[in-house]
Amino acid sequence: MLKSASGALANVLKRSLVPAARVTAVVPLRRSHGGPVESDEEFDSRYEAFFNRKDIDGWEIRK
């Protein structure tokens, strides 16, 4: 009985003295690089030009 009481007391003291580990969440955030802003039409034309190339292979498409 003394052994279990001293074990319980040790656990209580350990929890009160050792701070609990805090887990911080990683929040996905995309930051602008300050570069030139591309319009939707420019992006679409660049995207279509990439996939309409004659020398494109399966690896580049999967990337």
Curated annotation (Swiss-Prot):
Pathway: Energy metabolism; oxidative phosphorylation. SUPFAM superfamilies: Cytochrome c oxidase subunit E. InterPro entries: Cyt_c_oxidase_su5A/6, Cyt_c_oxidase_su5A/6_sf. GO terms for molecular function: metal ion binding. The keyword Secreted does not apply. Component of the cytochrome c oxidase (complex IV, CIV), a multisubunit enzyme composed of a catalytic core of 3 subunits and several supernumerary subunits. The complex exists as a monomer or a dimer and forms supercomplexes (SCs) in the inner mitochondrial membrane with ubiquinol-cytochrome c oxidoreductase (cytochrome b-c1 complex, complex III, CIII). This is Cytochrome c oxidase subunit 5A, mitochondrial. It comes from Manduca sexta. The gene is COVA.
